[in-house]
Amino acid sequence: MKSFFRLVLAAVVLLGGVSCTKKLPEQELYGTWNRQRTEVSIKLKEGAPEALKAGVPVVEGIFKDYFSNVLKSFTFESDNVLKAKVVNPISQTESTQKGTYFYQIGEQLKVELTVEDDPVIGMFALFYGGMIGTQYQPTLKDNDLKLQMTPGVAKLLVLLILGNKELAGMVKKAAPAIPGMTEADFAALIEGMVSNIEDVEMSVSLQRGA
């Protein structure tokens, strides 16, 4: 499974590297930015079953809750060095994958990713592999900053997770219980989603803070 993730991560890094990274324009943008919220928007293919359309908010909510619990903090140390931290919201056991990982996309953005207690590093590395290689638009107003994943990478990430029973189960486990939805209902919803997702938008909104 780890080798599979490494292959996918390599593809994601290549995809991410094609997109444009913009340097942070102002010194005042440096420092720690707390994770405020994760936004996920799923678009289905034209002609997708109505039942799936009704299930879109459910799946979007699951991913929002999960990644909001995973993402901890982002720190810009200079105009091209970003440090990010993630933690697994469900496992409390030590992992051999725990540590700090280094990435560089193109010539501009270097990333240090610190993983705490994470038995499925591939999933998080995939997320950040897509996130750090994408366009990020510094917004000085109200001290907000948004990291926007490229749609193609976001779609790949969501399909990879939903298409893997183990990972889909972990994401669902970390999310709040869904009233009235059985395991069979969830499995059917996920199966339909995998076949009918057209596009996915994913972003993390940050706010300056200690």
Model-derived regions: residue spans:
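Sec-dependent bacterial lipoprotein signal peptides
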Residues: 1-20
